[in-house]
């Protein structure tokens, strides 16, 4: 394990915009949901494998499973009782990587045999691996929410390096709660520190963690995405906002969500047109929202038929221009997006 120094960058004053959307003008999208056959298992964090199967975890049911979208067939691979899998990703060879959130490991699952191999965290304090993302060098980066780390995992060697995140002085202990994580084009991970008003990144060469302070101390970024210009977009769960952070200038701009300050935006994705999508979980039913950075407008709001309860994480499938999600209503869903639009690129 390597512990590193922390750097902090100061962000200029916040620019806050209104929602820019009238309810009657909102564009609707088609959402299909499949009922998961294992009741109250909290299916979540789907990921589409190279063969088209939709893999997901059952956080409360302690399993990994897949859905065949064409036939509606499900297949379950039970994990050890008490594993609490929180998230998964699938490699190019079909290998499934899952976060054993309650048992301090990252596991791999062979999609044919169901055989599991476990890679343990090198520090017992890293008790709850949370969200995984592939890097660009046959590696993975991940968050450890309660344990307060950002991690780097090399499957070929089994090596795990942990970077300590900053301490926080508010709510749910001292952990800054590293939560959502995504990669930029330079293979740097970006992390939402959910118990703070900070967004972090790690230099993969030095393993130094740098934080960006968001201007509103009440902000609580939960999930984020990185666009084609390496601009970071995040949802502020506490204040009901969508935010944009430009790491080159430190400029922050935010928009009030269509459902307002109590919208509780959670799961997030970005499509190949750089349009931003997220789910408002503070309203019933949950609402699937689209934002166009070009016009700076929320252009799409669609209610999720099951109600959803909460949608926690999403996966964009470029081949079908759709987003996959799991819901607390015990469903796996597919949101079919409007046709892609040209995106604007910036030299940097």
Regions found by a protein language model. Name each.
Residues 7-17:
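Bacterial N-terminal signal peptides
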Residues 309-348:
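Blade-level signature of beta-propeller repeat domains, shared across WD40, Kelch, NHL, RCC1
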Residues 63-66, 104-108, 148-152, 198-200, ...:
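A short loop-to-beta-strand structural motif that recurs across blades of beta-propeller domains
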Residues 54-60, 96-104, 140-146, 189-195, ...:
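Conserved beta-strand positions in repeat-built beta-propeller and related beta-rich domains
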Residues 39-50, 81-93, 124-139, 168-186, ...:
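Beta-rich, blade/repeat-based domains predominating
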Residues 68-72, 110-114, 154-158, 203-207, ...:
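Short loop/turn segments that connect beta-strands within beta-propeller blades
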Residues 24-40:
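A short helix->beta-strand "capping" segment at the edge of beta-propeller domains
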Residues 32-35, 75-80, 117-121, 161-167, ...:
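Beta-propeller fold detector
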